[in-house]
């Protein structure tokens, strides 16, 4: 009986090993996708910046362009933060409503 359980235990260990590896690969893929996206954004930023910078511009002009771009990006970040807060609030409200609906459905089950 002990011999019969050993292959099964080995199968479980192999399954766990494979499952962990699969999860690790998924995390690595997600991490690489974030790095790709971040670097693509950097390339786009540099492309945009090169469109604004013209030969003969002073350093002050270039710094002004960079400051303006930074302000625009900070405004976008603020907008996304506000949007996420609104979505989180809506999600919490929906969770409360769903919980209330679930409690209402459970009341008739208790009486039965």
UniProtKB/Swiss-Prot annotation:
Protein name in UniProt: Pole-localizer protein TmaR
InterPro entries: DUF496 (IPR007458), UPF0265 (IPR053375)
One Gene Ontology CC term in the entry: cytosol
Signal peptide start and end residues: none
One Pfam match: DUF496
Similarity comment: Belongs to the pole-localizer TmaR family.
Function: Pole-localizer protein involved in the regulation of several cellular processes.
Cytoplasm in keyword set: yes
Localisation per UniProt entry: Cytoplasm
Keywords: Coiled coil, Cytoplasm
Source species of the chain: Proteus mirabilis (strain HI4320)
PANTHER family recorded: UPF0265 PROTEIN YEEX
Annotated coiled-coil segments of the chain: 22-42, 70-104
